[in-house]
Amino acid sequence: MEKGITKPSILVVADDFTGANDAGVSLAQVGHTVDVAFEMPYRGDASVWVINSDSRAMDPKLAAMKITSLMSHLPLANNPPLVIKKIDSTLRGNIGAEIEALMKACGIT
């Protein structure tokens, strides 16, 4: 998908389809334009991108690698977007491994 904006103001990373859509709907309800993406690289015209990593059932190391790979396609330099990690309400998934990978990708150690 080739559209005008190549950098969102908010980026949400979810580990499954349901979580991605839940986050997207919540942000749309408060006035944001939202795109939900399932693969990278992605270019869209919404102010919010929600990325479904589909990593919930993966081994933690593989989930972290998936997050690192997804984030490598995003424009994080020069005024990076607000990055949000969507966490399952019952705490399923690779929360620690994915947050650590997101922090590294964003230059936070």
Language-model-derived ranges and their functions:
Residues E2-T109:
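Non-transmembrane, aqueous-exposed alpha-helical and coiled segments at domain scale
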